[in-house]
Amino acid sequence: MRKNRKYIFWIGIITFLFVGYFILDGMLFDGIKPIVVNKHGFQANYFVKNSVEQKAAIVLIGGGQWGDYWGQEFARKGFVGLSLPYRGKEGLPKLPEEINLEYFKDALEWLKAQPTVDPSKIIVMGASRNAELSLVIASIFPELITGVVAYAPSSVSWSNTVLAYNSNDLKPSWKYQGVDIPYVPMEKIVGNNSKTIETLQYWKDGLAKTDYVPQATIKVEQINGPILLFSGKEDKVWPSSLMADRIEQRIKASNFPHAFLNIKYEKAGHLISSHPEINSSSRTGNMTIMGKDYEYEFGGTIEGDKKAKQAAKIKLLEFIEKI
């Protein structure tokens, strides 16, 4: 009898803790929890409020903490967010090279069919290399996408070898229907005898490869909707403001029929592309080249990045409201 009472006691305690966890979790968590999607040919976290109203949807290319933050923010503002990783998880490629764009097409077609999504208002958004990818995706699938937001963008597609941790063999970063997306071929960045490395000139040298840049330039004029670019004028990782200006030049030359904004911030660096609620005091990142660790500069200032990210968030929400 005592033994049964003991079991009942512990079952009661476990039940109390289990129920209490969910009650407390609901009280403390005021965000919107994602619906995990792991079928239909892609993996993603889907953020949406319960509603019968169709809303604009934003696809966060690259997913991760950054994508989940924005997915939740957009859902809280009355939109839909899809945080979409494409590498580094089980079932996905390990490295960002030879990434098949059909993966994103599957996600976009699924998203477009959701009852809470307005199929005429689907935006892709990315930061840094994922800004490059967002622009590429939007230029190839104009029938599925009606807007792009790119933080610290690129005007061209690059080879896989721009990333030190990728394979050494020259490959495209992106492919579609078995065909390489044209790219600027780059040797891997070379280390030195110090503990720091400068990356900005590496990318500028790539942009000077006139034999490759014309065909590698992203065909932004094919994008079927407004484009919003953000960059920091003091970006020391890569020349994002310069590349944003090149995108603008191509847009102007094509008589682009949609809205276009190229917003550049003073005293801001590459971290304008980072999580907007995290203001890191670190001004350098880490890179491993041939087994040796180096530091590289992000550029900008702590205050400059903070102000830029706050201002950009306001502009971003205004942009989406207008689509």
State each model region's role.
Residues 77-92:
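Conserved alpha/beta-hydrolase
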Residues 95-115, 136:
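Alpha/beta-hydrolase active-site loop
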Residues 54-63:
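Short beta-strand element of the alpha/beta-hydrolase
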Residues 245, 257-323:
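C-terminal catalytic histidine-bearing segment of alpha/beta-hydrolase fold enzymes
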Residues 223, 229-231, 235:
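Short beta-strand/loop motif that positions the catalytic acidic residue
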Residues 137-204:
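Hydrolase active-site cap/lid region
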Residues 17-53:
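N-terminal cap/lid segment of alpha/beta-hydrolase-fold proteins
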Residues 116-128:
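Alpha/beta-hydrolase fold nucleophile elbow
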